């Protein structure tokens, strides 16, 4: 059986439908090839911030930026948790306490609120827009992470 992960599905779609819209929100849309590029930029940035299987928290609405960041977390070898911006503060704090995230990604619209809410937390807060402007794709790092993840999975025995 040919095993595929979510990144392989995304990359296959980008090869077949590079200019087709992958996702859209009320203010923007993104093609498959743009989504892969953005996710790889974010993944390259996050690879310097987290270790394999560590969480990345997100504080923003479901959007093109959010999906780019979530795929970026997977490229970095981590996992993601999208915090609902409408949740009560106490609930958000409990989620972060359980996750023990080192980094929280947000967008320009929610950045000030995230800084206010999480000022007492030991968590780095970064705007996804800033990552996309400044970060470059580091293919060698992303390839190493994927290879390590595939090696780990090939040795996994659920029984």
Regions found by a protein language model. Give the residues of each.
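Carrier-protein-dependent adenylate-forming modules in NRPS/ANL systems
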Residues: 1-159
């Amino acid at each position: 059986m040919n095993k595929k992960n979510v990144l392989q599905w995304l990359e296959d779609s980008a090869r077949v439908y590079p200019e087709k819209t992958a996702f859209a929100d009320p203010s923007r849309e993104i093609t498959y090839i743009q989504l892969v590029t953005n996710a790889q930029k974010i993944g390259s940035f996050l690879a310097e911030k987290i270790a394999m299987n560590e969480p990345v928290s997100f504080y923003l609405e479901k959007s093109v930026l959010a999906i780019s960041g979530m795929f970026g977390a997977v490229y970095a070898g981590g996992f993601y948790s999208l915090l609902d911006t409408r949740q009560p503060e106490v609930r958000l704090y409990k989620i972060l306490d359980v996750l023990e995230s080192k980094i929280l990604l947000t967008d320009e619209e929610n950045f000030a609120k995230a800084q206010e809410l999480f000022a007492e937390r030991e968590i780095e807060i970064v705007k996804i827009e800033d990552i996309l402007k400044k970060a470059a794709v580091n293919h060698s790092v992303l390839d190493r992470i994927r290879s390590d993840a595939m090696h780990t999975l090939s040795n996994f025995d659920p029984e």
